[in-house]
Amino acid sequence: MEKNLPDIFFFPNCVNVFSYKYSQDEFSNMSKTERDSFSLAVFPVIKHRWHNAHVVKHKGIYKVSTEARGKKVSPPSLGKPAHINLTAKQYIYSEHTISFECYSFLKCITNTEINSFDEYILRGLLEAGNSLQIFSNSVGKRTDTIGVLGNKYPFSKIPLASLTPKAQREIFSAWISHRPVVLTGGTGVGKTSQVPKLLLWFNYLFGGFSTLDKITDFHERPVILSLPRIALVRLHSNTILKSLGFKVLDGSPISLRYGSIPEELINKQPKKYGIVFSTHKLSLTKLFSYGTLIIDEVHEHDQIGDIIIAVARKHHTKIDSMFLMTATLEDDRERLKVFLPNPAFIHIPGDTLFKISEVFIHNKINPSSRMAYIEEEKRNLVTAIQMYTPPDGSSGIVFVASVAQCHEYKSYLEKRLPYDMYIIHGKVLDIDEILEKVYSSPNVSIIISTPYLESSVTIRNVTHIYDMGRVFVPAPFGGSQEFISKSMRDQRKGRVGRVNPGTYVYFYDLSYMKSIQRIDSEFLHNYILYANKFNLTLPEDLFIIPTNLDILWRTKEYIDSFDISTETWNKLLSNYYMKMIEYAKLYVLSPILAEELDNFERTGELTSIVQEAILSLNLRIKILNFKHKDDDTYIHFCKILFGVYNGTNATIYYHRPLTGYMNMISDTIFVPVDNN
């Protein structure tokens, strides 16, 4: 469906597009093309104003029940009006008078083609659209947006590239085409903060109709923005809620979905056309109940995110529109061209609002000498922060590879620098509180973070990035630090330059950067289980295909050996994380154990009941050797004795030397086996 977005339906960015009500005199002076633009108003008017409406007679005038109160009456016969009263907005016949809107209400019946609308119908649609506040113009003021979506406060002023008229037209054409859309743009153009809002607007106006060429029945479904982490769900939903002029969730078009969501974050009066901010896990549980699917941070290749892409592609007829958003297609463009059916690629040009300066700090040690390289890096970091210091009241972000390094670098910096130090990563629960301290402090704040802060979170007062250029890539029973890819570098650099000019200080040679194929270092059971649930053909229906298919097939055989029915697996998938697939054997035993185990997976709280249950699974590891690392850490070289990776070597750190065997509780907790 090729359809351009008329100017009158632009989303009000409150910069050069404002909410606007058109007069009948303005309509009279318009060209035919401009007048015809109002024909598309029939779709939002049918959904949001005329649904369940009827004809009434009010003071002798036929009107729609949404215009005035009155007794329900049979509609009059309609021919060409004898006279038009532009002031009263009425068509006058010899025997009756009818409002412009009521005339249109009676004429706009199912299967009527919109290009058949005459001037009389269009005038009524203009009035109905004015009442809904769905029109816009290049002149106006912010306060005109109050009430557009039931909001008590005006929309935010947004100068970002994604809400320019040009970008709005391009995004609308792609959305209405029902083709899968891959949307890229420089960090800071408003992909995460504005494009979902724009798609919400299009969904509010036109979502649920099979075509915009004629009037049909509609099936209204919300938009969903699927995100890899709960913190992102909370942050982005709050940003868009405020920018749409709301202060509370109830009654707004914004809803949140994630596990163990608190009562105060549940929208008890959601809108059918609204937007749901959800974790990937919960997006999959009701994927086909949404009309427009937006998957953000595609470049991260979050496992469940990649599975959603595979499922949506396999069942694309069940979704009206799919948007994949990423800062860069450095690693994925060719795969997406082949994988998606006839995709549309949209790039929103633009850069951060403010200039970003780059500074390279050379590390004279070769990274193959890991410990010496890191020690030199820490010394360089102190020097760099002293030379390139955020102003008072501002902050800098230090990107390191892992949670352990966050604590290591924070401890090192605190002894040498007089600034406020904070740690933020995916397991930190009080991020909002930390950010409030950062924003309210008159001092310099230094935030040490994992790659967690790469993703879309805009810290308002950050002026400096100090990038170590590494990421920890988890692998079954271990993992390794790798140098980042170009897309990760772009994300980190783009954390500054949004609110103020910024400085990006990097401590790694650019030649070290490389693409990271995450699926080759992941447990693969989710791919198997969701493939079974959604009838995916393996491996060809996967977005990213593992290099070693033997592991995929061994995983399938291992899952089959559990003797758990497909129906039960589907229930487990919908309700539990199952970070270790063996936990499934415990989840099916009893509801009480399932509740405690689920709490352990979510919070890390390990009760004796859960520990004993996991120990009963006999997830045994043989200790081959060990060596002393430092005062309270010993490195143990081990062999896995269970599951898909039986026989695989693993390295495990423990606070004292061990021999014999240990049992695995989780990917980070191990219990020595008593040799007596």
Swiss-Prot record:
Domain Helicase C-terminal: 366-535
Localization terms from the record: Virion
Alphabetical list of InterPro entries matching this protein: DEAD/DEAH_box_helicase_dom, DNA/RNA_helicase_DEAH_CS, Helicase_ATP-bd, Helicase_C-like, NPH-II, P-loop_NTPase
Reactions catalysed, as given in the entry: ATP + H2O = ADP + phosphate + H(+)
Enzyme class: hydrolase
EC number: 3.6.4.13
Span(s) of short sequence motif DEXH box: 296-299
Pfam families in the record: DEAD, Helicase_C, NPH-II
Binding, ATP: G185, G186, T187, G188, V189, G190, K191, T192
Main location: virion
Listed GO CC annotations: virion component
Coiled coil: none
Domain annotation Helicase ATP-binding: ranges: 172-347
Keywords annotated in UniProt: ATP-binding, Early protein, Helicase, Hydrolase, Late protein, Nucleotide-binding, Transcription, Virion
GO MF annotation list: ATP binding; ATP hydrolysis activity; RNA binding; RNA helicase activity
SUPFAM superfamilies per the UniProt record, alphabetical: P-loop containing nucleoside triphosphate hydrolases
Gene induction: Expressed both early and late in the viral replicative cycle.
Family per similarity comment: Belongs to the DEAD box helicase family. DEAH subfamily.
Function of the protein: NTP-dependent helicase that catalyzes unidirectional unwinding of 3'tailed duplex RNAs and plays an important role during transcription of early mRNAs, presumably by preventing R-loop formation behind the elongating RNA polymerase. Might also play a role in the export of newly synthesized mRNA chains out of the core into the cytoplasm. Required for replication and propagation of viral particles.
PANTHER family according to UniProt: ATP-DEPENDENT RNA HELICASE (PTHR18934), ATP-DEPENDENT RNA HELICASE DHX37-RELATED (PTHR18934:SF99)
Protein name as annotated: RNA helicase NPH-II
Taxonomic lineage from the root: Viruses, Varidnaviria, Bamfordvirae, Nucleocytoviricota, Pokkesviricetes
Gene that encodes the chain: OPG084
